[in-house]
Amino acid sequence: MGLHSGDTSELFFNDMRVPSDAVLGGLGKGFAALMDELPRERLIMAVGCVAASDGMLDWTIEYTMERRTFGEPVAKYQNSRFAFADMKTEIELNRALVEKSVNRYMKGDLSTEDAAMCKLASSEMQGRVADRCLQLFGGYGYMSEYKISRAYVDARVQRIYGGTSEVMKEVIARSLVGR
């Protein structure tokens, strides 16, 4: 569907032996090592969500300044202007959360739930921004020749990989009320 530049495939390791001196991190500790890296991975995703949203908004403003309907640039209509204001506000709110989380990470103090909140908020925001931007492109936004169409499709996976939005909510809820 999206991310056409990414090559995804399955790997199968049947009847394979790894010498004990070649095991990284210790036998049976791979899952724990993976879990330790998830907050950083989710933070990186959140940074990407904010950056992608910034880009989509920029493209959309540029396009709607040029595209005319009823003799006026689409950007001049109140609906478009309010959409720009809403999206910019949401992007900046998420940027603040990402920056706070980056600072915590740099101090070695980024919790699993903080990273989950950051990833949840920014990936959901990216989906909303992609949808509104595509709408402002009109019919052209639906055509794959336009980068907003590709960005819309690519935004969808942000709410899936690194832990789905539902998993992020569970991580956050557990930090509040336990299992």
Located regions from the model:
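FAD-binding subdomain of flavoenzyme oxidoreductases
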Residues: M1-E10
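Alpha-helical interface subdomain recognition
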Residues: E10-M16, S20, L27-K29, M35-R179
